[in-house]
Amino acid sequence: LGDVYKRQIMFPGGFSAGDEPDGSAKFFATAFQNAKMKEAVEKLLNERDGLALGICNGFQALIKLGLVPEGKIVEQNAKSPTLTTNRIGRHISKVAYTRIASNLSPWFNNVHVDDIFSIPVSHGEGRFVASEQELESLIAAGQVATQYVDFSGNPSMDIRFNPNGSMAAAEGLMSPDGRVLGKMGHSERFVPGLMKNVPGEKDQKLFKSGVEYFR
């Protein structure tokens, strides 16, 4: 717990138990409901100005814990925002175009609103669902961090561009203060020289921003 108390927390993607259902998110969520783990996370975020990032299954874990969009670990109910099965009912794996909709998060200190990136996505349960009221509130607060967009940079519900059918074309969400970020796209898969045949910018500089935040 000492390490959790002192630094950033990263919830990575990764299959577990056949990835059905909820992938490794269910195990993350169970572990972090532990009273001592919960206390350590809350102290990290509230007292030590820490950061947390969840990608793919890690994003699912953040949603299940309430860290996004609430910014704290809270009990979930049937009306809580969630990530559920892709609209096509199966796993998808492709490169999607995503737009920075809000850069209020320290994780996005090196990008600008309306920047567009080509980001790998690979998941079976990435469709963001929330009530209309909740969705409007998140958009108004700038908590919808990234969106799936078409070739013109417009948020899209077209399956060619929004592969899971997320409401508001949401690909990533953040906590109210931006220090907790969850996203479905695998920004960590960027390596210089990789995906040479795929057009577009691929480096969101997430980890560069995360390091610079503490300097």
Give the predicted meaning of each segment.
Residues 10-12, 54-56, 120-122, 184:
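Short beta-strand segments
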Residues 10, 23, 44, 80, ...:
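Generic, low-specificity signal for short hydrophobic/alpha-helical stretches with a mild N-terminal bias
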Residues 95, 100-215:
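C-terminal and late-domain segments of enzyme folds
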Residues 16-106:
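Cysteine-nucleophile active-site neighborhood
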